[in-house]
Amino acid sequence: MVAAVVLAAGASSRYGTDPPKQHVHLAAVLAALEASVVDEVVVVSGAHPLPIESVHCPDWEQGPGASLRCGLAALSDETEAAIVVLADGPDLDPRAVDRVIEHWRADGGDDILVANYETGTRFHPVLIPRALWPSTPDEGFKGWQPGRLVDCSDLTPPGDVDFSPAGS
C-alpha cells in the first residue's frame, strides 16, 4: 500500500495572503492524487488548520521535516511507502505520481525515489519507503539524497507557487 502525504502546514508568510497559498491549490493537488494509484491520502495542516479531515502538526514552525513526520506518523501500519507532494504545487500530474509508485513497486528497495523532469529538475512527487521514516531530516525530503530518479521528462513539473510564475 502506498499513501500520499500532502504538506500544507506552512504560514504562507512570503505571500501574506488569505487564504493561505497552499489551500488555494489544494483542490487541484487532491484531484491529481485521486486520479492516481495512491491508496490513502493524508493532508498535514499547521499554521492554518483545514476544515477537512487532516493531520494537524503543532510543530509546523519547525519546518517541513516536522510536517513530514506528522504526516508519516498518521499513516496506517499497512503502509509500505509514502508518496510526498506539496500543497502549493498546483500542476501535479497524476501520471508522475503513478510512475514513481510503479517504479518502486517494480523494483522495491529502501531508496528514495524522486521524479526527474525534462529540465533536469528533481521535484515532487517523492516516494519514501517506510524503512527511512524514522530518519526524517529537519528539512523534510530535501535532506535525503535521492536513491533513484524516475524519468518524468515527458511531463510538466508540478510547479511551486513560491517560485513559479504559473502559480502567481
Question: Predicted regions span which residues?
Answer:
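Active-site regions of enzymes building and remodeling cell-envelope glycoconjugates
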Residues: P51-W60, R148
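Short, hydrophobic beta-strand segments that form beta-sheet elements in well-ordered domains
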Residues: D39-A47, A115, T136
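Short beta-strand segments
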Residues: L7-A9, V44, V85-A87, A115-Y117, ...
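Short glycine-rich anion-binding loops that position phosphate/pyrophosphate groups of nucleotides
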Residues: G10-S13, A47-H48, W60, A87-P90
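N-terminal glycine-rich phosphate-binding loop and ensuing alpha1 helix
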Residues: M1-S45, V97-V100
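Conserved alpha/beta core of the MobA/IspD/sugar-nucleotide pyrophosphorylase nucleotidyltransferase superfamily
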Residues: W133-S168
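Conserved beta-loop-beta/alpha segment of the NTase-like Rossmann-fold superfamily
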Residues: E61-R130, P134-S135
